[in-house]
């Protein structure tokens, strides 16, 4: 049996990313099929311990400390380095090892592994902090919220499990305005999470038009402080034309000073002020809103589009069946926090066609299973 498992490991190292993901899913199915009823129940009910344990490890700096050395460390050494009580720390270390967050090489001997390095990274710490402080409280309230609302699909962003979790009357955006600490956590997480899911070869080809340097090439609508505009300038250096970054006034106060990018305050629910741009770009914006509000946003853009304008929607495009667990979890997060959702291709088509647009193409980035560019033009 060990030989078969080793053979799978070798196969995984030479597989494409799509093959690797299929292998992971198949092995997950196999693992579940081997569980007893008690195994299954224990796995499900104890899942919250992983994020709680990871948060403790991040707070203590355990993962960072272990990754700074190639050698194993004992609990006493780690206690001195972290300031934790040795008796407590050894119990935590045993849990981390059992959850495969760290490696246990012997009695009282612990070291970093692949998971440790992931949790010690800036992206890993950001994931843990944001999910522990912001996502989990909202998801924890979701069962009670759905029961209380008689299992109706939530679409009112002011009446969600998010409001129940944080005793808040406004939406998530006003919550951030009142809580700068969580706003910083969220912005940092968004920057790190989305930094590696754009296929820059695809983007460069799309944006390579014979545009006048004085004409507007792209309007990044709801683009935050400008991280994606910065990446566009860095990864597509030969494109011609102006880049305009738009977001709310309070966001634009912190816009990055990016050469070749103009910052402009704009609310997505107001008519688009830039007329006749070559590309209007919405990245991760529409999944924050239910369909009715998305239609309002899209109609505001359609009114500004010229005959040569193209709308580019950069989002997840889900299949109609066999959606992976990561995407379904994201969909439930959007429901609980925004009253919105992730959408299938057929849903996207219905949405854009209802606002005077027609689908021209879908270009998948190929770096994430479902992330892609929805290319739409104005119906004439």
Curated annotation (Swiss-Prot):
Binding locations of S-adenosyl-L-methionine: 222-223, 247, 283
Pathway, per record: Secondary metabolite biosynthesis
GO function terms (MF aspect): O-methyltransferase activity; protein dimerization activity
Biological process (GO), any one: methylation
Disrupted-gene phenotype: Impairs the production of usterphenyllins and uscandidusins and leads to the presence of trace amounts of atromentin.
Matches recorded under PROSITE patterns: SAM_OMT_II (PS51683)
Enzyme class, broadest EC rank: transferase
Keyword terms: Methyltransferase, S-adenosyl-L-methionine, Transferase
Active site: 287
Membrane spanning residue stretches: none
Record-listed E.C. numbers: 2.1.1.-
Family: Belongs to the class I-like SAM-binding methyltransferase superfamily. Cation-independent O-methyltransferase family. COMT subfamily.
Further facts: In the absence of ucdC, its substrate, the terphenyl triol intermediate, is unstable and is partially reoxidized to atromentin. Most of the terphenyl triol intermediate is very likely converted to non-detectable products.
Physiological role: Nonribosomal peptide synthetase that mediates the biosynthesis of usterphenyllins and uscandidusins, p-terphenyl derivatives. The pathway begin with the biosynthesis of 4-hydroxyphenylpyruvate (HPPA) from L-tyrosine, possibly by the aminotransferase ucdG. The nonribosomal peptide synthetase ucdA then condenses two HPPA units to produce atromentin.
The protein's name in its UniProt record: O-methyltransferase ucdC
Organism: Aspergillus ustus
